[in-house]
């Protein structure tokens, strides 16, 4: 586990991203992706996971928000992977159910060094502001694949797209915070002896 500020710069023809992450922070975030609703979600994620994050993304938002959202997920996942592995002295597993008014979303995750995403019961279409709601799944997939975490997120109920997506980000945040909780009785939390 790396309890320090990690930094990354990632530049492609579609996005130019610089980011900093500290996994044992206070939830302080400076987010500027050019996608207002996504900034709001990342701030909520950082706040409830107690991550300190700085993210600056200049993307081809004149085309679509997809590249910016996915690439920010890649960057966050890459930083999480660097910070987390090898796993030692933490809980490893985390889960959470977060409600926001009529919406409820569950998240269970395993800092297993095995990438997998289950994203269930999100059948909504449309946008929140200018944000296509299916981009939330692209973000979670990019994070899980690049952080090598097993991530299950499921909508339990909800009608308002804003509430549903925000509950998903917050549920992921709380589950991650719980999985990262330090436990001095745990060395490597695996019967294999390594993750």
UniProtKB/Swiss-Prot annotation:
Its EC number is 4.2.1.19. One of its GO terms (molecular function) is imidazoleglycerol-phosphate dehydratase activity. The keyword Cytoplasm applies. PANTHER family: IMIDAZOLEGLYCEROL-PHOSPHATE DEHYDRATASE, IMIDAZOLEGLYCEROL-PHOSPHATE DEHYDRATASE HIS7. InterPro entries: IGPD_sf (IPR038494), ImidazoleglycerolP_deHydtase (IPR000807), ImidazoleglycerP_deHydtase_CS (IPR020565), Ribosomal_Su5_D2-typ_SF (IPR020568). It is found in: Cytoplasm. Gene3D superfamilies: Imidazole glycerol phosphate dehydratase, domain 1 (3.30.230.40). Belongs to the imidazoleglycerol-phosphate dehydratase family. HAMAP family: HisB. CDD domains: IGPD. Keywords: Amino-acid biosynthesis, Cytoplasm, Histidine biosynthesis, Lyase. This is Imidazoleglycerol-phosphate dehydratase.
């Amino acid at each position: 586990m790396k309890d320090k500020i990690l930094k990354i710069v990632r530049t492609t023809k579609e996005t130019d991203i610089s980011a900093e992450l500290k996994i044992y922070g206070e939830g302080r975030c400076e987010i500027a992706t050019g996608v207002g609703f996504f900034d709001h979600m990342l701030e909520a994620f950082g706040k409830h996971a107690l991550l300190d994050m700085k993210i600056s993304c200049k993307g081809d938002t004149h085309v679509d928000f997809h590249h910016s959202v996915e690439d920010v997920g890649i960057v966050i996942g890459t930083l999480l992977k660097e910070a987390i592995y090898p796993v030692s002295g933490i809980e490893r597993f985390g889960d959470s159910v977060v409600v926001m008014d009529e919406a409820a979303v569950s998240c269970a995750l395993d800092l297993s060094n095995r990438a997998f995403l289950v994203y269930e019961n999100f059948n909504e279409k449309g946008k929140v502001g200018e944000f296509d709601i299916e981009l939330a799944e692209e973000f979670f997939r990019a994070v899980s694949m690049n952080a090598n975490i097993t991530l299950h997120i499921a909508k339990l109920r909800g009608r308002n797209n804003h509430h549903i997506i925000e509950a998903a980000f917050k549920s992921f945040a709380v589950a991650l915070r719980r999985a990262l909780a330090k436990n001095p009785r745990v060395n490597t939390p695996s019967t294999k002896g390594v993750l």
